Amino acid sequence: MTLLALGINHKTAPVSLRERVTFSPDTLDQALDSLLAQPMVQGGVVLSTCNRTELYLSVEEQDNLQEALIRWLCDYHNLNEDDLRNSLYWHQDNDAVSHLMRVASGLDSLVLGEPQILGQVKKAFADSQKGHLNASALERMFQKSFSVAKRVRTETDIGASAVSVAFAACTLARQIFESLSTVTVLLVGAGETIELVARHLREHKVQKMIIANRTRERAQALTDEVGAEVISLSDIDARLQDADIIISSTASPLPIIGKGMVERALKSRRNQPMLLVDIAVPRDVEPEVGKLANAYLYSVDDLQSIISHNLAQRQAAAVEAETIVEQEASEFMAWLRAQGASETIREYRSQSEQIRDELTTKALSALQQGGDAQAILQDLAWKLTNRLIHAPTKSLQQAARDGDDERLNILRDSLGLE
């Protein structure tokens, strides 16, 4: 039995290829059934995200194993084998275990240390358990990877610092305001970055959010999710005074929030401070706003310095995390090898017990027929000894004939010979 991890990710393949190799939730069961129908596959898990598609497999070794699995993947997705082969990575046994542990811990992610991947790996594993796993070693590998990811989170700072613009903006707000639960936040825009910001703010107990967008329809789904109020961009001037924090990210070619608008808002707020985080390019907030007293303006470049600093911290933490992964993968493989030895020991014990039972039954039968007890016991002892040492004796003789001193010493050691 061999453990494999093979696939493509954001480092090896462009999005144009990654999108062709994805497995949709609707077809995942069918794909797993097809995968397990391959004669060499004992069990499988399919991990498919926007940044990676990977197969984790327990397989029987055979000739052309790699070719057979690549062919299955290409046939399933109607791909040219050369296109896939140039982007595919292939990990076996210890390397496969290490790879899964790194993936689950966020060490192989586009954003180093991002936590979402662990949930995606857990879902892939859960989906595979619906009648598709069929391999205890593979199941144990995933369970171990989950505990390793938790250990990495607990024992290192891999997830402690913001490394996305959205998260950095929220981190900045939390550094400036003692509690976000009492502030009002105005979000300008309704794109992906603002969506992430809104979710981060909701996680940090922000109670009052206003979302301003050019079209109310696009903002409505987000407001339903986070419980915000929707206004149009034209309403910003009137509502700016209500906001303690303004975070803006639109595609507007011209500034949306000008110096005069902020001056009026500050006057209405009796100069209560305002934090403005402009993460748009081109900028949504006129740079002159930063010169106003009690208006604290941060641009995307300011956030980038925070992100760069935090990324360096994560990279330092990643070194610690890699050490944990290396140690845990080594321990897992030792456990797996021990399972193989346990099976051999069970087979050897069963074989020995079968010989014992066979000869004992014959001896008891002879005694019941009135045979000489001493002679029967001596015969039992002689036959039992010969049957039990027959296979080791042949192995010792063969090692001696082959001149294989290393094997001979291993056999001597296993038989307890001085």
From Swiss-Prot:
Top-level lineage group: Bacteria
Pathway(s) of this molecule: Porphyrin-containing compound metabolism; protoporphyrin-IX biosynthesis; 5-aminolevulinate from L-glutamyl-tRNA(Glu): step 1/2
EC number in record: 1.2.1.70
Catalysed reaction, written as an equation: (S)-4-amino-5-oxopentanoate + tRNA(Glu) + NADP(+) = L-glutamyl-tRNA(Glu) + NADPH + H(+)
SUPFAM superfamilies to which the protein is assigned, alphabetical: Glutamyl tRNA-reductase catalytic, N-terminal domain, Glutamyl tRNA-reductase dimerization domain, NAD(P)-binding Rossmann-fold domains
A molecular function GO annotation: NADP binding
Keyword S-adenosyl-L-methionine applies: no
Keyword vocabulary terms for this entry: NADP, Oxidoreductase, Porphyrin biosynthesis
Swiss-Prot/TrEMBL site (Important for activity) positions: H99
Any one GO biological process: protoporphyrinogen IX biosynthetic process from glutamate
Active-site positions on this chain: C50 (nucleophile)
Residue numbers binding NADP(+): G189, A190, G191, E192, T193, I194
Signal peptide: none
Protein residues bound to substrate: T49, C50, N51, R52, S109, E114, P115, Q116, Q120
Pfam families: GlutR_dimer, GlutR_N, Shikimate_DH
Written domain comment of the UniProt record: Possesses an unusual extended V-shaped dimeric structure with each monomer consisting of three distinct domains arranged along a curved 'spinal' alpha-helix. The N-terminal catalytic domain specifically recognizes the glutamate moiety of the substrate. The second domain is the NADPH-binding domain, and the third C-terminal domain is responsible for dimerization.
Additional remark text: During catalysis, the active site Cys acts as a nucleophile attacking the alpha-carbonyl group of tRNA-bound glutamate with the formation of a thioester intermediate between enzyme and glutamate, and the concomitant release of tRNA(Glu). The thioester intermediate is finally reduced by direct hydride transfer from NADPH, to form the product GSA.
Similarity section: Belongs to the glutamyl-tRNA reductase family.
Protein purpose: Catalyzes the NADPH-dependent reduction of glutamyl-tRNA(Glu) to glutamate 1-semialdehyde (GSA).
Summary of subunit composition and partner proteins: Homodimer.
Protein name: Glutamyl-tRNA reductase
Organism: Salmonella dublin (strain CT_02021853)
